[in-house]
Amino acid sequence: MNRLGGLSLPLRPVCLFCRAQTSLALSPLQGGQAVRSIATGRLRRRARMTLSKDVAKSSLKPKRTDRGKLGPFPNMNQTRARVREDPRSRSPAALKRSGETEEKPAMNTESPLYKALKMQTALAPISYGKRTAIKAKIAEITSFDAFTLLPIVRNSIFSQALPGIADAVPTPIQRVAIPRLLEDAPAKKQAKKVDDDEPQYEQYLLAAETGSGKTLAYLIPVIDAIKRQEIQEKEMEKKEEERKVREREENKKNQAFDLEPEIPPPSNAGRPRAIILVPTAELVAQVGAKLKAFAHTVKFRSGIISSNLTPRRIKSTLFNPAGIDILVSTPHLLASIAKTDPYVLSRVSHLVLDEADSLMDRSFLPISTEVISKAAPSLQKLIFCSATIPRSLDSQLRKLYPDIWRLTTPNLHAIPRRVQLGVVDIQKDPYRGNRNLACADVIWSIGKSGAGSDEAGSPWSEPKTKKILVFVNEREEADEVAQFLKSKGIDAHSFNRDSGTRKQEEILAEFTEPAAVPTAEEILLARKQQQRENINIPFVLPERTNRDTERRLDGVKVLVTTDIASRGIDTLALKTVILYHVPHTTIDFIHRLGRLGRMGKRGRAVVLVGKKDRKDVVKEVREVWFGLDS
């Protein structure tokens, strides 16, 4: 019964499919829509603005239709046997199921030397025949007088570059490079027809072992060329002045007046004649100091710019109204200046890339090539200089400069015999894997080994300070190792990128500059001061207690650093290097040990080898590299 009080009839079940058919019959469909199901009763239109997903595809696979499928009786009416010429190789899984074994390639029968020095293949080799030819050539030059240098430049070599060395002779790289760089036009370039795409300047590669005098090898020819250009410009200016005087006299006679004012000559401010590029600010300061020493007698203007200097000082140095002849800079800073002032590179005749293996790697290559291309119109000589020539640099130079002159020495990629290499296994007693303890023990042993030898000479003279350089692989470990050495009574300092600029200069100066010999006045002053302290007990020297010596190591200074100090830094006063870690590559090994044995001096290096370090590499380095002639 419903709400009105009447009886309600039971509901009749309705089929949805029947209702759909009824609705379809009431609205007749057209064409292909009549055969579609209820789910797709109305055809969906394709959107016009929908982008295709197959635009980027080079080719689309055609859909395979039923007609292309093989039937139940394929390949029955064949008149020719289709046999595969090359048998199909079986998969390893099929060989394993059949019980057969795949033929394995023969084991590598190379000697352990090849396996241990696998990273040495990154260095470009120098043939034995070429080494012999170079030795015969450099034996002919015995003094700097054999070079065609200006007298003022030759005299400055002995008084400024190499003071205190009476019998200074050219090093092998200087004997090879200086004569070639002094030439104006080598015969190799004259005989070849110059192409428009090829560089119009000469290219040179100076490659020699560390500490062999490569800086002077390119500085001396560059300074000589700058002075010769200056002499030629003075002669041209003199002739131009004479011509102007004659024109003025003729104008006075003819009573002619100049309608246009004379254009002043272009200023040389911010337009150096030569540029030397180095990778770090420390090398900028070092090369700049060498140039400044030459400038005292040769008389030319030089300047340095780096990130350690203020913008005001950089501007005053580069854009000095008096002009600048030689500029030392880093590539990134010079490239940024050249973008705002392109005329900076408009007068460059000599461009030097020191530490070329760094300046031509991935990080510096775009900037270095940009500077070279902007200086190309006026460039006369492009010089690359490096102690290591990786295969990447070698192939890059062959690609960019196929006609480059390669000036190398016989001992390239070698550590001379005058450097002794020792190995300390930190896994043995008493260290038991403690690398910090092993490093401190080695430093104490070195500091105590020669104690008393310097003190016996004079009671008034201070003992000679021993300087030790410790190399670590990570920047963070430099501070940690230095703090540990200080806790063991060792005067240690850390040197890395995080150190302040002034602190870096002070620390680095102690290890790069040799100690000055005290004068007679300084010795007399120290003697009087010590006599005043001991006036109550005359003629008796104070006895040294053992309290301080037990807790402190006197007469030793240690610098803990990374690879920032391994390239180009002239550590002539250094005699000991400790490798806290085994270097990652052969190139790092060479540059770290290259802080020793510079300019013919002796040195010793100690490598701390742990459980995870490559002991075989260190062993083969001792046997191979130290076997070459020094």
UniProtKB/Swiss-Prot annotation:
Q: What is known of its domains?
A: The Q motif is unique to and characteristic of the DEAD box family of RNA helicases and controls ATP binding and hydrolysis.
- Transit peptide location: 1-46
Summary of the function given for this chain in its UniProt record: ATP-binding RNA helicase involved in mitochondrial RNA metabolism. Required for maintenance of mitochondrial DNA.
Q: Where in the cell is it found?
A: Mitochondrion
Name recorded for this polypeptide: ATP-dependent RNA helicase mrh4, mitochondrial
Which Pfam family is one of those matched by this entry?
A: Helicase_C
Q: What top-tier enzyme class does this entry carry?
A: hydrolase
GO MF terms here are: ATP binding; ATP hydrolysis activity; RNA binding; RNA helicase activity
Native organism: Emericella nidulans (strain FGSC A4 / ATCC 38163 / CBS 112.46 / NRRL 194 / M139) (Aspergillus nidulans)
The transmembrane residues are none
Underlying gene: mrh4
- Domain Helicase C-terminal per the UniProt entry, residue ranges: 452-630
Q: Primary place of residence?
A: mitochondrion
What reaction does this enzyme carry out catalytically? ATP + H2O = ADP + phosphate + H(+)
Return the InterPro entries for the record.
DEAD/DEAH_box_helicase_dom (IPR011545), Helicase_ATP-bd (IPR014001), Helicase_C-like (IPR001650), P-loop_NTPase (IPR027417)
